[in-house]
């Protein structure tokens, strides 16, 4: 198995073609509109191939996008060429920016990929540091119910020249859902090449996340259902957090 997203990077957009980034951008803007001042600069944490960053840049925001994978950022660079986008290869828990931003967004359960609570607490502190006073931090997470429910599941994606198999295993003692991925790609000569990756996501409780945010200096912390402006339902698979840095 190779490092996460080394194999996936060039095929990630095809494998996530069902993700509605436009809806995510719309949702972010609904939260921006609730602030008492305009949002001009936005940071995306865990930007991947830059799909959300590109949309927000096209809507007029000065974007900074951070990801740990150089391969994903290479795709993002091509996608965002000509737009007001700054791309940085950084570990979220060691986040540093030359200037503050008005809002930070993080989607597609990037927070779950920080598998050590101490690292996530440090990440939240760094996010608070780079936000201007009163700034917004908006992110989503898979809930423990979602990760526990994935145990033993197999996921398939395929088309004419791509075949991908995911296997999920949940480990209760570690509170981690591990994904083993096998990717088969048809080459130009008709032969097939195979690659593999290993991913882990941590099952944070909503109470833990709320506590980490408060510890980092955030206030007015609210939870929402999946891209809706109301509280999540019991047993929700995905929850959004919106938190503000103190003025």
Regions from the language model: what does each represent?
Residues 138-210:
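SAM-dependent methyltransferase
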Residues 51-94:
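Class I SAM-dependent methyltransferase SAM/SAH-binding core
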Residues 121-133:
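A short glycine-rich, Lys/Arg-flanked "PGG" loop and its adjoining helix->strand segment in the class I
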Residues 96-103:
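A short acidic, Gly/Pro-enriched loop at the edge of an enzyme's catalytic core
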Residues 202-247:
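C-terminal lobe and adjacent flexible extensions of AdoMet/dcAdoMet transferase-like proteins
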Residues 1-46:
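Conserved class I S-adenosyl-L-methionine
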Residues 107-109:
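Residues lining the SAM
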């Amino acid at each position: 198995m190779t490092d996460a997203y080394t194999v996936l990077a060039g095929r990630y957009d095809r494998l996530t073609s069902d993700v509605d980034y436009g809806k995510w951008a719309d949702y972010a803007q609904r939260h921006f509109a609730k602030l008492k001042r305009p949002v001009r600069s936005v940071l995306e944490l865990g930007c991947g191939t830059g799909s959300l960053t590109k949309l927000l840049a096209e809507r007029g925001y000065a974007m900074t996008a951070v990801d740990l994978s150089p391969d994903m950022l290479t795709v993002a660079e091509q996608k965002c060429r000509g737009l007001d986008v700054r791309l940085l290869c950084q570990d979220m828990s060691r986040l540093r920016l030359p200037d503050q931003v008005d809002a930070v967004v993080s989607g597609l359960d990037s927070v779950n990929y920080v598998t050590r609570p101490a690292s996530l607490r440090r990440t939240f502190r760094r996010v608070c540091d780079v936000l201007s006073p009163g700034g917004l931090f908006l992110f989503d997470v898979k809930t423990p119910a979602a990760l526990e429910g994935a145990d033993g599941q197999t996921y398939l994606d395929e088309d004419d020249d791509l075949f991908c198999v995911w296997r999920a295993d949940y480990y209760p003692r570690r509170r981690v859902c591990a994904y083993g991925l096998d990717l088969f790609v048809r080459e130009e000569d008709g032969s097939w090449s195979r690659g593999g990756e290993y991913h882990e996501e941590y099952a944070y409780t909503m109470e833990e996340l709320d506590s980490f945010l408060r510890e980092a200096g955030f206030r007015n912390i609210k939870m929402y259902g999946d891209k809706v402006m109301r509280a999540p339902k019991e047993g929700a698979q995905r929850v959004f957090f919106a938190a503000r840095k103190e003025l």
